[in-house]
């Protein structure tokens, strides 16, 4: 499932599509050492 992210609302389907994303499409900051770009919570880039 893609989720809108970024200020232009592009669809985020995979890592670095428009922001850092988990495989499931959750946008997240790149602070997870084990799964870079993944997080348990949503994150909208500015």
Swiss-Prot record:
InterPro entries: Conotoxin-I_CS, Toxin_19. Expressed by the venom duct. GO terms for molecular function: sodium channel regulator activity; toxin activity. This is Iota-conotoxin-like R11.2. The keyword Oxidoreductase does not apply. Iota-conotoxins bind to voltage-gated sodium channels (Nav) and act as agonists by shifting the voltage-dependence of activation to more hyperpolarized levels. Produces general excitatory symptoms. Pfam families: Toxin_19. GO terms for cellular component: extracellular region. Disulfide bonds join 5-19, 12-22, 18-27, 21-38. The modification D-methionine is found at residue 44. It comes from the Eukaryota. Belongs to the conotoxin I1 superfamily. It is found in: Secreted. The cysteine framework is XI (C-C-CC-CC-C-C). Keywords: D-amino acid, Disulfide bond, Ion channel impairing toxin, Neurotoxin, Secreted, Toxin, Voltage-gated sodium channel impairing toxin. Residues 46 form a propeptide.
